[in-house]
């Protein structure tokens, strides 16, 4: 059997524009922040904030810029979490999710109507897109590592 990979596209998918998008699960004091969208076809859905990656930047740079623009905070400790692909409004969206931290909590709202601080045990109390639910599951898998200090093994 050949050692190769082939992705088959449906007619609908092959004509779609592709977007690279990033989002960040901000973890502070044992809770993760989710945000409710306030416009467009995603109005009312919750997500991890982020946005489109510009051609001149890395995904991590895009995430830091988007958090500053949308929430007016500086994030750090940006760590890769998971990828997801979604199809919305004629776009094939390649979503990369990171975890991050900050020394401050956001107060500015621009593309969101509210911020909620929750834990993975209660995160499904809020409405997420199917593609974002895969990211939530990835977050649940690493949650103990994000919220408990590491103890050295002797």
PLM regions: where:
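C-terminal structural segments of small proteins and small subunits
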Residues: 126-129
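Conserved Nudix-box catalytic region and its N-terminal flanking loop in Nudix hydrolases
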Residues: 28-69
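Active-site-adjacent beta-strand/loop module that shapes the phosphate/pyrophosphate-binding cleft
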Residues: 84-106, 116, 120, 132, ...
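Conserved N-terminal beta-strand and adjoining loop/helix that marks the start
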Residues: 13-32, 83
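A short coil-to-beta-strand element that immediately follows conserved catalytic motifs
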Residues: 73-83
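Short, Lys/Arg-enriched N-terminal segments with co-localized hydrophobic residues
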Residues: 3-15
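Charged phosphate-binding loop/patch that engages nucleotide di/tri-phosphates or the phosphate backbone
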Residues: 131-154
């Amino acid at each position: 059997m050949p050692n190769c990979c082939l992705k088959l596209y449906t007619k609908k998918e092959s004509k779609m524009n592709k977007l690279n998008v990033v989002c960040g699960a901000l973890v502070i004091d044992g809770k993760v922040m989710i945000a409710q969208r306030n416009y467009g076809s995603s109005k009312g859905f919750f997500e991890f904030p982020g946005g489109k990656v510009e051609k001149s930047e890395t995904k991590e740079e895009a995430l830091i810029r988007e958090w500053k623009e949308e929430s007016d905070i500086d994030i750090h400790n940006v760590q890769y979490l998971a990828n997801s692909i979604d199809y919305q409004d004629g776009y094939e969206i390649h979503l990369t999710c990171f975890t991050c931290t900050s020394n401050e909590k956001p107060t500015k709202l621009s593309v969101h109507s509210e911020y909620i601080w929750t834990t993975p045990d209660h995160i499904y109390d809020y409405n997420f897109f199917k593609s974002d639910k895969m990211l939530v599951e990835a977050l649940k898998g690493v949650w103990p590592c994000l919220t408990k200090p590491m103890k050295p093994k002797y």
